[in-house]
Curated annotation (Swiss-Prot):
CDD domains associated with the record: HisRS-like_core (cd00773)
Compartment list: Cytoplasm
Gene name of the record: hisZ
Pathway: Amino-acid biosynthesis; L-histidine biosynthesis; L-histidine from 5-phospho-alpha-D-ribose 1-diphosphate: step 1/9
Keyword Protein transport: no
Lineage, uppermost ranks: Bacteria, Pseudomonadati, Thermodesulfobacteriota, Desulfuromonadia, Desulfuromonadales
Protein name from the UniProt record: ATP phosphoribosyltransferase regulatory subunit
Originating organism: Syntrophotalea carbinolica (strain DSM 2380 / NBRC 103641 / GraBd1)
Molecular function terms, GO-annotated: histidine-tRNA ligase activity
Described purpose of this protein according to its UniProt entry: Required for the first step of histidine biosynthesis. May allow the feedback regulation of ATP phosphoribosyltransferase activity by histidine.
Subunit description: Heteromultimer composed of HisG and HisZ subunits.
Keywords noted in UniProt: Amino-acid biosynthesis, Cytoplasm, Histidine biosynthesis
Any Gene Ontology biological process: histidyl-tRNA aminoacylation
Length: 428
């Protein structure tokens, strides 16, 4: 009988992954490191469900995420349910419907998986792991600056040094576009040209419109307004509309707070960044690590989201894509994420009670230990211990005897009293 050989990846739907122990340990390290930063900034955990009713969830989704939502019939009641493509709308719903009487602002953090439809191309994740925060009920530039400073501190806590946080402001774009009165197809074409930084294509589109020189200059400037803080001055020399100038003042105020936090060196500006136009209501930002073109985190202000669930409250936040973060930091996490275990305990012969008592005593003392239950040679056990990241091996003779302690790093040995270890009188 012929058996078909199956590649492990072919056993999974496209866009999802198994995470073996090494990668899983790194992901857990990333989660915990971010959680520690969130806690230092006084954010409390919240846990939304995996499934939502589609009609409820879609209130909080932009058009882009609606198209990426996995949906199916609930057999219990026939209603459409969905796997969430983003956690922020869930948090907005919970605060608006379950925490209406809670004091504001609410500082909430989360970690979870989301699912998104993607195009059929290799390497595109459909299952994404997010860790993020939402600051609900607080308006003003200091709140937005707090989000950016937190994101920077998260990256610093992971040992990253070469990274930037690119800041945009959707109100700046809206101010430039006000008054053009373009039909939807033309407006979309202009928006796409700006997002691509396609100055020649943008100029060609604008040539079909009857714009005065000042308005033409404002629109044409958008693909070029990116860089350091000097971008704000360049933009101020170009735009004359009040809406865009208010957006620039907002960015200056945010920058002043970031300078007080001492993190301004990581900040750049991109006033042609148009991500989330139908979702964000002010500042937006994305974090990029050196050498990686995909953002590891993104965030911004979304003052209208909770209102879609019945509670009008300003809000801002951000989320890390842990898979992108893992891809960027994989090599640097090797020593930090893979923590060794303390001791593996061996005992030959039919009576294993001494080894079992020793294992329990060591765990009670706070050590991470395991019994090597398989009967094999000492050398095979030592080889196994090294591969499984144990620091020591203990070889037990009998209930009353001594214990042979072997340090796997260098092979050095010493003999210690079993009773001393059981009594907690010996420390590894």
């Amino acid at each position: 009988m012929n058996r078909k050989i199956t590649v492990p990846e072919a056993m999974l739907p496209r866009g999802v992954k198994d995470f073996l122990p090494n990668k899983a340990a790194k992901l857990e390290y990333l989660k915990q490191s971010l959680k520690d930063v969130f806690h230092r900034w006084a954010f409390r955990p919240i846990m939304p469900p995996t499934l939502e009713y589609l009609d409820v969830l879609e209130r909080g989704l932009g058009a882009g995420l609606r198209d990426k939502t996995f949906r199916f019939d609930d057999r219990q009641n026939g209603k459409l349910v969905a796997f969430c493509p983003d956690i922020t709308p869930q948090v907005a719903r919970i605060v608006a419907t379950r925490m209406k009487g809670a004091p504001l602002p609410q500082r909430l953090c989360y970690n979870g998986k989301v699912l998104r439809h993607t195009e059929q191309q290799a390497g595109k994740d459909r299952e994404i792991i997010q860790s993020g925060v939402e600051l609900i009920g607080l308006q003003g530039p200091e709140a937005d600056a707090e989000m950016i400073a937190m994101a920077i501190e998260c990256l610093q806590s992971l040992g990253a040094t070469e990274f930037t946080v690119d800041i945009g402001q959707v109100e700046f774009f809206h101010g430039v576009m006000d008054g053009l009165n373009l039909p939807a197809p033309q407006a979309l074409a202009v928006q796409q040209a700006i997002a691509r930084k396609d100055a020649s294509g943008l100029s060609e589109l604008l040539s079909e419109l009857s714009l005065d020189d000042r308005k033409y200059a404002e629109v044409m400037a958008l693909p070029r307004l990116f860089g350091g803080r000097e971008v704000l001055d360049r933009a101020a020399d170009i735009v004359v509309n009040d809406r865009s100038r208010r957006a620039l003042e907002n960015l200056r105020q945010i920058l002043a707070v970031l300078e007080a936090y001492g993190v301004e060196e990581h900040v750049t500006f991109d006033l042609g960044e148009l991500r989330g136009l139908g979702y964000h209501t002010g500042v937006t930002f994305q974090g990029f690590l050196s050498g990686m073109g995909t953002a590891v985190c993104s965030g911004g202000r979304y003052d209208t989201l909770t209102a879609r669930y019945g509670m009008d409250a300003p809000a801002t936040g951000f989320a890390f894509n842990l898979l992108n973060l893992l891809m960027a930091l994989d090599r640097t996490l090797e020593s930090a994420a893979v923590q060794p275990f303390d001791v593996m305990i061996l005992q030959s012969g039919p009576d294993k009670r001494a080894a079992q008592s020793l294992a329990r005593a060591l765990r009670d003392q706070g050590y991470a230990c395991a019994r090597d239950i398989i009967e094999r040679s000492l050398q095979d056990s030592l080889d196994y211990g090294r591969k499984m990241h144990f620091r020591h091996v203990m070889v037990v003779a009998d209930q009353a005897g001594d214990v042979r302690l072997i340090r796997l790093a260098d092979g050095s040995e010493q003999t210690i009293s079993l009773q001393a270890v059981l009594a907690g009188e010996f420390r590894l």
